[in-house]
């Protein structure tokens, strides 16, 4: 078979003991000595070095086949076994079995194969670019449709919402005649403008501003100086002291003027302590309402038939099954501290807090408060 010259991809010519085979997307080299297929030229080069000692000039004796090598030194190396085998180096470029035309054909085949691979790669790249362009076009079309739909919906809403919105206040409010006349004139002008415009859409809002006409001033208080004091049952009117009334009818008009002056001074003098008493009673009522003895709300029946007591302090709204528990809970809302410590000035809302204070601060155990809690 000889030494074929193989043209590699890097345009280097090698003389090797093998045959170059090209098929589809790959090529391989078949060793002529052992018929082993190798994928790359480097592997084939290593194979002939390690297995057949090609570069070392030693031809193995186990090669049974008569090779048609074009080297006389190889024939001498393959002599009978009784003769001494001399190490003769083998020349690489000595055989010229394959002509230059065949080498050109092999080179052309390799170039054609590389060109085909490049074309396939270019085609794949073009297909990928086309797919990307199609996807981008689809996205653009979808966005355009969405924008168009949004514009149409906004236009429809504007067309449907166009018109004149008239907001009229309730008739129970008192309006002056001038405001009513002005509002009627504005409504008539708006209606005339809308009829003249025709297809022109406009949003007009007319507000009837209501003005509360102040009523007549209250009458002045009565001349007699009567003091009003709050009582448990209601309001009582106390007449002035009889000594301050003075003589009536004897002095004529002059006497009446003097009596009026004396009455005004007496009313100013007596009004101050009476007002102080009224303020003290109001504070007492406020304290009673803030204390824990305030009247609780009545029991409320639930769906399951049970009666619950609800705390009516502010927005608390907690429910209790027993009234005593609810009264104990109301101490939380109260500002009153009924339980005072005998050892210091501390005070507490609940007796348990006082007991804890005595145990921690004064080391007193088992001593209860002498103060009796208020009965609910």
Curated annotation (Swiss-Prot):
Protein function: May be a transcription factor for genes having (A+T) stretches in their promoter and/or enhancer regions. Binds to AT rich DNA.
> Where are the disulfide bridges?
none
**Record's SMART domains?**
ZnF_C2H2 (SM00355)
Q: What are the top taxonomic ranks of the organism? A: Eukaryota, Metazoa, Ecdysozoa, Arthropoda, Hexapoda
Its Gene Ontology cellular component terms are: nucleus
Biased-composition ranges for Low complexity?
149-163
Q: Which gene encodes it?
A: ATbp
- Compositional bias annotation for Pro residues: 214-224
* Family matches, as PANTHER family: KRUEPPEL-LIKE TRANSCRIPTION FACTOR (PTHR23235), KRUPPEL-LIKE FACTOR 15 (PTHR23235:SF120)
Subcellular localization: Nucleus
**Name this protein carries in UniProt:** AT-rich binding protein
């Amino acid at each position: 078979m000889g030494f074929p010259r193989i043209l590699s991809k890097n345009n280097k010519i090698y003389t090797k003991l093998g045959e170059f085979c090209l098929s589809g997307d790959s090529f391989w080299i078949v060793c002529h000595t052992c018929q082993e297929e190798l994928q790359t030229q480097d592997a084939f080069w290593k194979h002939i070095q390690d297995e057949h000692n090609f570069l070392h000039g030693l031809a193995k004796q186990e090669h049974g086949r008569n090779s048609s090598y074009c080297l006389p030194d190889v024939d001498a190396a393959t002599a009978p076994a009784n003769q001494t085998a001399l190490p003769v180096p083998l020349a690489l470029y000595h055989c010229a079995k394959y002509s230059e035309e065949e080498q050109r054909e092999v080179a052309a085949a390799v170039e054609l194969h590389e060109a085909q691979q490049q074309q396939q790669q270019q085609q794949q790249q073009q297909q990928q670019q086309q797919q990307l362009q199609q996807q981008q076009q689809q996205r653009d079309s979808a966005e355009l449709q969405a924008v168009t739909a949004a514009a149409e919906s906004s236009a429809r809403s504007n067309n449907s919402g166009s018109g004149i919105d008239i907001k009229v206040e309730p008739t129970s409010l008192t309006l002056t005649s001038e405001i009513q006349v002005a509002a009627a004139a504005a409504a008539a002008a708006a209606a005339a403008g809308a009829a003249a415009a025709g297809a022109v859409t406009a949003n007009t809002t007319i507000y009837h501003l209501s003005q509360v006409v102040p009523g007549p001033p209250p009458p002045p208080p009565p001349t007699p100086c009567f003091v009003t004091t709050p009582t448990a049952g209601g309001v009582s009117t106390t007449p002035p002291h009889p000594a301050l009334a003075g003589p009536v009818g004897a002095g004529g008009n002059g006497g009446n003027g003097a009596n009026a002056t004396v009455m005004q001074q007496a009313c100013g003098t007596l009004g101050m302590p009476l007002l102080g008493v009224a303020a003290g009673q109001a504070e007492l009522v406020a304290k009673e309402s803030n204390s824990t003895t305030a009247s609780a709300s009545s029991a409320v029946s639930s769906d399951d038939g049970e009666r619950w007591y609800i705390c009516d302090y502010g927005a608390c709204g907690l429910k209790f099954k027993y009234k005593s528990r609810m009264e104990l809970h109301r101490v939380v809302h109260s500002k009153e501290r009924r339980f005072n410590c005998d050892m210091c000035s501390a005070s507490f809302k609940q007796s348990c807090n006082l007991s804890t204070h005595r145990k921690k601060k004064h080391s007193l155990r088992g001593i209860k408060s002498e103060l009796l809690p208020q009965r609910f």
